[in-house]
Regions:
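Transmembrane alpha-helices and adjacent helix-loop boundaries
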Residues: 1-191
Length: 191
């Protein structure tokens, strides 16, 4: 990401967002229920990002990647064993509210928010942490705070992506958010 942290846990955040939005949308099958589901998905993924980010961002490089991958697998196993998520069978019959115009709207909004963030003072602080963390800390940048904030923002966007995924494909299963989903996200970032 922008702070140079290598995370493989975004499949876990995406699954939190997908299940949250699916459960709310199935109970309230209206556009307002869908929007509430997206908001709840973003908030719950952000809380999970805070819970995971505080202890794991002391790690660096491969160790951070392994710890966040472990988080994603723990979340997947929890969803396999929960009754409310219908276990390994997952949830089906999710009302579809997402189509291409919705996807375009959320993608354009995400690009706009992130590009404005990068150009801001806080975005430049995150980029300086990625380039040289020791120099950033010497210049007075609160590196831990910015790393945790960037991790939370990333988890919120992953939760939103999961919510859109659930509404677009009608089905959410724990197998959809396994190790390979994290690798898919990594491949998309690299290429």
């Amino acid at each position: 990401g922008f702070t140079g942290q290598f995370s493989l846990g975004h499949a876990g955040f995406m699954s939190i967002g997908a299940y949250t939005c699916a459960l709310i949308t199935m109970r309230i099958p209206t556009i307002w229920g869908f929007l509430l589901g997206i908001l709840a998905a973003i908030i719950l993924s952000g809380i999970a990002g805070l819970v995971v980010g505080l202890p794991t961002l002391r790690l660096r490089g491969d160790y951070l990647a392994i710890a966040t991958l472990g988080f994603a697998e723990i979340i997947r196993i929890i969803f396999v064993n929960l009754e409310i998520t219908n276990g390994a069978a997952g949830l089906s019959g999710i009302p579809q509210f997402v189509n291409w115009p919705w996807m375009f709207f959320f993608t354009a909004g995400t690009v706009l928010l992130i590009s404005n963030f990068i150009k801001s003072t806080h975005g430049r602080a995150c980029i300086s942490i990625r380039e040289d963390e020791i120099a950033s800390e010497t210049m007075g940048v609160a590196t831990t705070r910015y790393k945790v904030t960037a991790f939370i923002v990333g988890s919120c966007f992953a939760g939103m992506a999961g919510a859109l995924y659930a509404s677009y494909f009608y089905v959410v299963k724990p197998d959809l958010f396994g190790f390979m989903k994290s690798i898919d996200i990594l491949i998309i970032l690299v290429f």
